[in-house]
Amino acid sequence: MGGVTVRDVDAQKFIVAYAAFLKRQGKLPIPGWVDTVKTSASNELPPQDADWYYVRAAAVARHIYLRKTVGVGRLRKVHGSTKNRGSRPAHHVDASGAVDRKVLQSLEKIGVLEQDEEKGGRRITQSGQRDLDRIAKTTVDEEEEDDE
């Protein structure tokens, strides 16, 4: 099989694999408030998963890989959800901008993303693309081993 890219891998499996890679690597800077903050105004409680920041970073990296340039506003819309307003009609609420902004800044610090001066927003770097493709390849290899 030729070059395997992120597009060729199931999204959920890739995000879990890349989040595990980021945690194992230990270079991703994590803010001190991640264990207490909610990720959106539509949520009642903070995330139950202790490693949710790594999962969000992996999801953001994959999202930007697939779409070239993405800003904080677009990520807020993507990670937002429906707010339960009781007996009133539900409405979409964007996710926390601070969380997505800090994730982008963390990925920038480890060299996965860079700022796009012309269009605005962030784009994937060559080293970041190489890392993501390598993780995608290992994910496909693990799937093939499981099939045998």
Swiss-Prot record:
InterPro entries linked to this entry: Ribosomal_eS19, Ribosomal_eS19_CS, WH-like_DNA-bd_sf, WH_DNA-bd_sf
Membership in a protein family: Belongs to the eukaryotic ribosomal protein eS19 family.
Region (Disordered): 79-98, 116-148
GO terms of biological process kind: ribosomal small subunit assembly; ribosomal small subunit biogenesis; translation
GO molecular function: RNA binding; structural constituent of ribosome
Composition bias type Basic and acidic residues, residue spans: 130-140
Protein name: Small ribosomal subunit protein eS19
Biased composition regions of type Basic residues, renumbered to the chain: 79-90
SMART domains, sorted: Ribosomal_S19e (SM01413)
GO CC annotation terms, alphabetical: cytosolic small ribosomal subunit
A Pfam family of this chain: Ribosomal_S19e
Alphabetic keyword roster: Ribonucleoprotein, Ribosomal protein
Source species, domain of life: Eukaryota
